[in-house]
Amino acid sequence: MPITEEITERLGNSVTCLRQKYLTEEMLSIIGNMDVLVGVRLHSLIHAAIMDVPMIGISYDPKVNSFMKSMGMKALCSVYDFEGEYLCEEFGSVLENREKILEKVKKHRDILVGRLNLNEQLIKGLLEGEEKICE
């Protein structure tokens, strides 16, 4: 059984599984209205961070683990060792500690945005031929 079907089956009506394609703006709007996002794909987790939504990552690839680590969190499990009861427990914990988790998400997101801005400045400096771009 695909993992999304198992999640939906175990959590019932409190879960919506998105199966169609959406424009980025639509997806951000949908995610922004969620209490918690359970994501397998990297971009769903990135969108949750952008929209200040607590996330639970289920890893299928090391990049998901790396992103969750950069957010000060860990992926709950991998798609290969998924256990529905762990997700239910984590889901409840995230809802219970939502505000504290949101603070962590915002803090780590802001750190990543700062790194992105620095990279942008460095690239711009290289393109403009600046001799000294780092101190």
Sequence positions of predicted segments:
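Active-site anion-handling motifs in enzyme catalytic cores
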Residues: 1-135
